[in-house]
């Protein structure tokens, strides 16, 4: 019932040098080929001197100040063209 060697699982999880080298090469390959939105992080702390940070107004035409709104979203309510059932829908004005 009990294993003859108490630490037998340590040997099963060990990795040899060729596997470690292959894992390192794959990690470097995938890290090198990841894309980011900007190349350097030097522009993170840039502040526009002409922008008033105390003014918390949201730009018009933008959703939460980030995404532009192109079309207004209609109200979600049942219409005569949709959400009707059977003959009652055909007979109702």
UniProtKB/Swiss-Prot annotation:
InterPro entries: IDA-like (IPR039639). IDL4 is only partially redundant with IDA. This is Protein IDA-LIKE 4. Its main location: secreted. One of its GO terms (cellular component) is extracellular region. May be involved in floral abscission. PANTHER family: PROTEIN IDA-LIKE 4, PROTEIN IDA-LIKE 5. It comes from Arabidopsis thaliana (Mouse-ear cress). The gene is IDL4.
